[in-house]
Amino acid sequence: MTDNTRLRIAMQKSGRLSDDSRELLARCGIKINLHTQRLIAMAENMPIDILRVRDDDIPCLVMDGVVDLGIIGENVLEEELLNRRAQGEDPRYFTLRRLDFGGCRLSLATPVDEAWDGPLSLNGKRIATSYPHLLKRYLDQKGISFKSCLLNGSVEVAPRAGLADAICDLVSTGATLEANGLREVEVIYRSKACLIQRDGEMEESKQQLIDKLLTRIQGVIQARESKYIMMHAPTERLDEVIALLPGAERPTILPLAGDQQRVAMHMVSSETLFWETMEKLKALGASSILVLPIEKMME
């Protein structure tokens, strides 16, 4: 029998988002063994169950109220949303927040030896894709008629196999397209992972747990986007040094023993510190510059 007091979260069992989703939950302090083949894994330290399923099942589980939360790519979520609307349904869910992983783009690609004069080049053509609804919405907005060839995998081989004239598929580096004699010609949708919640009334204990989880996720993402910086900085150029390092709060300034011309400065910077920034700090007279990763962060 299902325990309705436990928060149920669906995530991808294997694939593009699986490792990052697992890492996010671990960094949020959820102790769970996700290295087994079991469909449902129970957290050791929180009333949370993790359902490990196919990515295209996750929006369905959330929209149908089977699970409380889902970690899913926006591309899969939007495709299912359009699919249900096309069938006359009114799917309900909440997007709690966008996450900082799973970035990709859904793009049109054509054979490298064919001319490209914009989307109109696809008028009347056959296009292979795993995202027929996103493709249709985009080309309908352009007033372009086309024939759809639905494939659930290996979309990039369709033109070479004579199944389609072009493809619409996810792209990260473009290496797979190049290996199959294709080139990316148009981006139709940009996607990241997101956290979604089912519609409907939520038990107070579950909602409190969701709020706690959101706070921790915010802390994890902030920590990944921030660095803890320590340095010795000249007193007379302190404002210039601080201007190079935008942060959530003002830095901590400490005196240096026996040195009236410099101070020790500690701060959390909200931007990734590149070598160019460190070189600018050094040019302003800063020294002993240390840039450290942050494990956890809460403002």
UniProtKB/Swiss-Prot annotation:
<keyword id="KW-0547">Nucleotide-binding</keyword>
<comment type="similarity">
    <text>Belongs to the ATP phosphoribosyltransferase family. Long subfamily.</text>
</comment>
<dbReference type="InterPro" id="IPR011322">
    <property type="entry name" value="N-reg_PII-like_a/b"/>
</dbReference>
<dbReference type="InterPro" id="IPR015867">
    <property type="entry name" value="N-reg_PII/ATP_PRibTrfase_C"/>
</dbReference>
<dbReference type="InterPro" id="IPR013115">
    <property type="entry name" value="HisG_C"/>
</dbReference>
<dbReference type="GO" id="GO:0000287">
    <property type="term" value="F:magnesium ion binding"/>
</dbReference>
<keyword id="KW-0328">Glycosyltransferase</keyword>
<keyword id="KW-0368">Histidine biosynthesis</keyword>
<dbReference type="InterPro" id="IPR018198">
    <property type="entry name" value="ATP_PRibTrfase_CS"/>
</dbReference>
<dbReference type="Pfam" id="PF01634">
    <property type="entry name" value="HisG"/>
</dbReference>
<dbReference type="InterPro" id="IPR001348">
    <property type="entry name" value="ATP_PRibTrfase_HisG"/>
</dbReference>
<dbReference type="GO" id="GO:0005737">
    <property type="term" value="C:cytoplasm"/>
</dbReference>
<keyword id="KW-0808">Transferase</keyword>
<dbReference type="GO" id="GO:0003879">
    <property type="term" value="F:ATP phosphoribosyltransferase activity"/>
</dbReference>
<comment type="pathway">
    <text>Amino-acid biosynthesis; L-histidine biosynthesis; L-histidine from 5-phospho-alpha-D-ribose 1-diphosphate: step 1/9.</text>
</comment>
<dbReference type="GO" id="GO:0000105">
    <property type="term" value="P:L-histidine biosynthetic process"/>
</dbReference>
<keyword id="KW-0963">Cytoplasm</keyword>
<dbReference type="GO" id="GO:0005524">
    <property type="term" value="F:ATP binding"/>
</dbReference>
<comment type="function">
    <text>Catalyzes the condensation of ATP and 5-phosphoribose 1-diphosphate to form N'-(5'-phosphoribosyl)-ATP (PR-ATP). Has a crucial role in the pathway because the rate of histidine biosynthesis seems to be controlled primarily by regulation of HisG enzymatic activity.</text>
</comment>
<dbReference type="InterPro" id="IPR020621">
    <property type="entry name" value="ATP-PRT_HisG_long"/>
</dbReference>
<keyword id="KW-0028">Amino-acid biosynthesis</keyword>
<keyword id="KW-0460">Magnesium</keyword>
<comment type="subunit">
    <text>Equilibrium between an active dimeric form, an inactive hexameric form and higher aggregates. Interconversion between the various forms is largely reversible and is influenced by the natural substrates and inhibitors of the enzyme.</text>
</comment>
<dbReference type="Pfam" id="PF08029">
    <property type="entry name" value="HisG_C"/>
</dbReference>
<dbReference type="InterPro" id="IPR013820">
    <property type="entry name" value="ATP_PRibTrfase_cat"/>
</dbReference>
<protein>
    <recommendedName>
        <fullName>ATP phosphoribosyltransferase</fullName>
        <ecNumber>2.4.2.17</ecNumber>
    </recommendedName>
</protein>
<keyword id="KW-0067">ATP-binding</keyword>
<keyword id="KW-0479">Metal-binding</keyword>
